[in-house]
């Protein structure tokens, strides 16, 4: 019975354990403004889709609320540097008809998160690259994969700073 009591105390203590660092943005960052990224590509859909996904992920994964730039604790800015679509990945098995079965998109962005209270750069990374594969004539599906991966890399990068 004594062993059960000791084991219970150890298990409960483990439930109360938490990390003081590495958990995201500094405590005073409660709101964030995501400025639409500059678009250096010919694709008009990427900026809007990336903006929407990043706003949702910051709230759900980092627990910050969206705010206008003038009232936000932090500001996210960036540039979409490259978007390449229609890169052939897989071909049909029929040698008589060499058609592409799968294609790939590649997305490259630069991003910066700045603490507006202190002026300090919280996270900055150039040339974050992600890819997405899609079936013939389904580019939006591949683009969605690439955007989700970019957003995930940004969130994980911001979390790892603390």
Predicted features along the sequence, with ranges:
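Short coil-to-beta-strand
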Residues: 122-126
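Conserved acidic
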Residues: 42, 46, 50, 101, ...
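A periodicity- and composition-biased signal for non-globular, repetitive helical segments
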Residues: 8-9, 61, 149
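Sec-dependent bacterial lipoprotein signal peptides
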Residues: 1-15
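Surface-exposed short loop/turn segments
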Residues: 60-65, 70-121, 131-143, 152
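A structural "domain/chain start" motif
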Residues: 14-56, 68-71, 85-88, 114-117, ...
